[in-house]
């Protein structure tokens, strides 16, 4: 079992070599992705992201601000990695087939909670899920969710 390190990624520099570093829907929440990548770049030669990305220039500012997100175009993400000599070696899009079942799953589970259990964060999650369901076609035009593998 691996030890857990409690740290802000912006302040963390690993002292171990890793086969792979994995970001699951978290890269978009980094304040400074360049700093984080610089911190971890000497500890791995492979980084995998499952990440939201912009597909259009219609930036959903109010939505992403509620979640403290920075959603980049894939070419911007690639440039962050390119600065550290990482190349995109694999890309697979998921949102077209995963958005609707994911939203339905969240809504079904949120419906099981009573009003006392619905904290402000849970209320925001529910509001977001309903927004995504009602605006699915627009969301799918503007935002993607992909697995991106970067290697050097």
Please describe what each predicted stretch is.
Residues 68-91:
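Short alpha-helix
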Residues 90-152:
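Conserved Class I S-adenosyl-L-methionine
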Residues 25-30:
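A short His-aromatic
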Residues 22:
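A conserved beta-strand element that flanks and buttresses the S-adenosyl-L-methionine
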Residues 1-11:
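Conserved SAM-binding strand-loop segment of SAM-dependent methyltransferases
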């Amino acid at each position: 079992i691996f030890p857990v390190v409690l740290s802000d990624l912006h302040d963390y520099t690993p002292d171990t070599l890793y086969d792979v570093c994995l970001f699951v829907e978290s890269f978009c929440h980094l304040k400074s992705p360049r700093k984080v990548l610089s911190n971890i770049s000497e500890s791995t030669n492979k980084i995998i992201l499952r990440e939201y990305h912009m597909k259009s220039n219609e930036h959903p500012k109010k939505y992403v601000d509620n979640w403290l997100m920075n959603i980049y175009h894939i070419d911007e993400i690639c440039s962050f990695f390119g600065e550290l000599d990482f190349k995109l070696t694999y890309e697979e899009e998921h949102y077209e087939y995963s958005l609707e079942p994911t939203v339905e799953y969240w809504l079904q589970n949120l419906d099981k909670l009573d009003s006392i259990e619905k904290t402000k964060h849970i209320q925001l999650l529910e509001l977001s899920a309903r927004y995504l369901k009602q605006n699915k076609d627009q969301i799918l035009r503007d935002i993607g969710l992909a697995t991106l593998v970067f290697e050097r």
